[in-house]
Structure formats: structure tokens, C-alpha cells
């Protein structure tokens, strides 16, 4: 998946409060709702709220993402 496609899916999901499934380059999977997508060179990450974990937010490097799909 291209970087532009990854940003497109994450941006859509972030703007519409939709869950995504992310597969990283090391084949780990994360499912959650994006709360922020930061493409600035000093951050370059997406923040996700895992499903059912309203008090938890995790960050993933955009460079570590291989695939994103809407859930």
C-alpha cells in the first residue's frame, strides 16, 4: 500500500470516527479508531484508540504501517 493510500484511509477514518485494522511491517495487527494523524517530520505517527479501551491511546509510526483497511 502506498504512503498516500495509507494517509487517505487514516484521514477518512479519523474524520468519520471509523475503526481501522493496521498491519505493520513486522506483521503485527492493531485495530482501533484513529484520533490523530500527524505527518510532520518530527512526529510522523498516527494515534489510535483501541476498540473498547476508551482510556487508552497508542501511537504508531507511519513508516511502520504496511496496510490499513476500514473495519
Each model region followed by its residue ranges:
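Conserved RNA-binding domains used in RNP assembly and mRNA/RNA metabolism
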Residues: 1-71
Amino acid at each position: 500500500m502506498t504512503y498516500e493510500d495509507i494517509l487517505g484511509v487514516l484521514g477518512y477514518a479519523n474524520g468519520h470516527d471509523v475503526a481501522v485494522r493496521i498491519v505493520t511491517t513486522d506483521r503485527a495487527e492493531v485495530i482501533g479508531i484513529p484520533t490523530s494523524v500527524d505527518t510532520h517530520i518530527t512526529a510522523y505517527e498516527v494515534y489510535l484508540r483501541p476498540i473498547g479501551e476508551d482510556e487508552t491511546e497508542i501511537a504508531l509510526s507511519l513508516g511502520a504501517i504496511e496496510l490499513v483497511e476500514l473495519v
